[in-house]
């Protein structure tokens, strides 16, 4: 029988300390969820799923070898940061009916770079990944997020902002498919890592394609503003739970597979 390591326990305690004030503050300032408030319900369900995923990833670090612990810990940090922000976003939505744009982009400015770090870490675990891979992924991420934020808060027109954001995303896709990161995975990774890297790439391709749909329905399509806000938040919420938790599960799977193969 395996005993939960003190490191895993400490990680869980730290996560609980981070999440608890957010839950308490959100609960003390919010109204009850209406039975027909599907956006608010989605915020709550996803925040709970993110908390559960955080506990899972932190506990599972004890099952993997040392070179995979950082990757799995980063997966837990992604879901932890997202969970905290989702409690606040839910509170904003339930109280005001407004889109919690600022909280959402603060979340993305932390979690999306961490997701890109996962590509770098998984390559570093199987060889010498260059710093250039890391910085190119960071640059693409920041261009994508800054463009989207500028359009959503009205700093620039929504169409130019959309194009800037899409350009950042395209730059990321180039790096992980055709750039140095993609070539390193194809030429040097074992089959389990290669499969995980490929799945992660398709999440960034297909899973991230959900976000432009939310932006389009929220800001570029004509129609009722209230309905547009609901559609935008539902789409963003579904995209977040898919991309952040699924990403972590892929990392967990390859970490456990590789660790057991070498043990």
Task: Describe each PLM feature range.
Residues 22-104, 120-263:
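Polytopic alpha-helical membrane-helix bundles and their juxtamembrane interface segments
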Residues 114-118:
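Ordered, amphipathic secondary-structure segments that act as subunit-interaction surfaces
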């Amino acid at each position: 029988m395996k005993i939960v390591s003190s490191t895993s326990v400490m990680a869980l305690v730290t996560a609980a300390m981070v999440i608890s004030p957010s839950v308490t503050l959100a609960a003390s300032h919010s109204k009850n969820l209406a039975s027909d408030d599907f956006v608010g319900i989605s915020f709550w369900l996803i925040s709970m799923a993110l908390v559960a995923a955080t506990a899972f990833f932190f506990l599972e670090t004890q099952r993997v070898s040392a070179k995979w612990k950082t990757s799995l810990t980063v997966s837990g940090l992604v879901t932890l940061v997202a969970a905290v922000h989702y409690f606040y976003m839910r509170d904003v939505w339930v109280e005001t009916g407004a889109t919690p744009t600022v909280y959402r982009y603060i979340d993305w400015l932390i979690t999306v770079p961490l997701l890109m770090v996962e590509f770098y870490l998984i390559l570093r675990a199987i060889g010498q990944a260059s710093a250039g891979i890391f910085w190119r992924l960071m640059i693409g991420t920041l261009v994508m997020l800054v463009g989207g934020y500028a359009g959503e808060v009205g700093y620039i027109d929504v169409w130019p902002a959309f194009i800037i954001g899409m350009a950042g995303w395209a730059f990321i896709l180039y790096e992980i498919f055709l750039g140095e990161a993609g070539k390193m995975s194809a030429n040097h990774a074992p089959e389990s890592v290669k499969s995980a890297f490929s799945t992660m790439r398709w999440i960034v391709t297909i899973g991230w394609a959900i976000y432009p749909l939310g932006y389009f329905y929220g800001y570029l399509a004509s129609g009722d503003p209230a309905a547009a806000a609901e559609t935008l938040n539902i789409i963003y919420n579904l995209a977040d739970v898919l991309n952040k938790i699924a990403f972590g599960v892929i990392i967990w799977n390859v970490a456990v597979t590789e660790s057991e193969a070498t043990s």
